[in-house]
């Protein structure tokens, strides 16, 4: 690689490190993450499930989080119920074709979500229509609603029982904070549910 590429990568890593350091000191984010973990634990203990939605990079995060919950994060333990609503290409394309892309997640929440479940909605901007519609439908159906967003996505909070705000307005950094925080939440969930088994 040439020096310019090295400098770009080093600059990104430095910005990422600074953003993570801010997040680690953000008392509002940490408190919100703890409450989110507790809400998900309550649902899973009751035999309910976690539904997760997001677009683009946030869709990848949705799948990653679901995999940590259904598979395992660190400890060998029973599977817990989590579904990323970003993975069924037939449902996504049928709903998108028949109802419009803005409804690809809301329609799945309507079909799969039941009272007591949790919807985790990830949107770096907090303004994605497909995400906001999913949150509205979840509220109608009695799901607990959780949002992950960035510094400019606070309006999304009106539809969320709990909102985690990454302290950045830069999309890649927001995504990195979301995933790192989600890992902490998964570890907290796993530890709490493993205590039930001991």
Swiss-Prot record:
UniProt keyword annotations, A-Z: Carbohydrate metabolism, Cytoplasm, Isomerase, Metal-binding, Zinc
One Pfam family linked to the record: SIS_2
Catalytic EC class: isomerase
Listed cofactors: Zn(2+)
Binding site for substrate: 55-57, 68, 97-98, 123-125, 128, 175
UniProt: Zn(2+) binding residues: 64, 68, 175, 183
Record bears the keyword Zinc: yes
Listed SUPFAM superfamilies: SIS domain
Localization in the cell: Cytoplasm
Associated pathway: Carbohydrate biosynthesis; D-glycero-D-manno-heptose 7-phosphate biosynthesis; D-glycero-alpha-D-manno-heptose 7-phosphate and D-glycero-beta-D-manno-heptose 7-phosphate from sedoheptulose 7-phosphate: step 1/1
GO molecular function, one term: D-sedoheptulose 7-phosphate isomerase activity
Assigned EC number: 5.3.1.28
Reactions mediated catalytically: 2 D-sedoheptulose 7-phosphate = D-glycero-alpha-D-manno-heptose 7-phosphate + D-glycero-beta-D-manno-heptose 7-phosphate
All copies of domain SIS, residue ranges: 40-198
Primary residence: cytoplasm
Cystine pairs: none
Physiological role: Catalyzes the isomerization of sedoheptulose 7-phosphate in D-glycero-D-manno-heptose 7-phosphate.
Annotated PANTHER family: DNAA INITIATOR-ASSOCIATING PROTEIN DIAA, SEDOHEPTULOSE 7-PHOSPHATE ISOMERASE / DNAA INITIATOR-ASSOCIATING FACTOR FOR REPLICATION INITIATION
Subunit structure: Homotetramer.
Miscellaneous comment: The reaction produces a racemic mixture of D-glycero-alpha-D-manno-heptose 7-phosphate and D-glycero-beta-D-manno-heptose 7-phosphate.
Protein name as annotated: Phosphoheptose isomerase
Gene: gmhA
């Amino acid at each position: 690689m040439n020096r310019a590429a090295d400098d770009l990568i080093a600059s990104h890593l430095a910005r990422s490190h600074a953003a993570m350091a801010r997040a680690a000191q953000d008392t509002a984010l940490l408190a919100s993450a703890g409450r989110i973990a507790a809400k998900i634990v309550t649902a899973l203990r009751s035999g309910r499930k976690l539904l997760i939605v997001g677009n683009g990079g946030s869709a990848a995060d949705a799948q990653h989080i679901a995999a940590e919950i259904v598979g395992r994060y660190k400890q060998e333990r029973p599977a817990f119920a989590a579904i990323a609503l970003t993975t069924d290409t037939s449902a996504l394309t049928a709903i998108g074709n028949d109802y419009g892309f803005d409804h690809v997640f809301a329609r799945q929440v309507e079909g799969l979500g039941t009272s007591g479940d949790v919807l985790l909605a990830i949107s770096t901007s907090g303004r994605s229509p497909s995400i906001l519609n999913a949150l509205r439908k979840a509220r109608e159906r009695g799901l607990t609603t959780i949002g992950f967003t960035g510094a400019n996505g606070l309006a999304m909070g009106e539809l969320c029982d709990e909102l985690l705000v990454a302290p950045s307005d830069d999309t890649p950094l927001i995504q990195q904070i979301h995933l790192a925080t989600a890992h902490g939440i998964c570890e907290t969930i796993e530890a709490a549910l493993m205590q039930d088994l001991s």
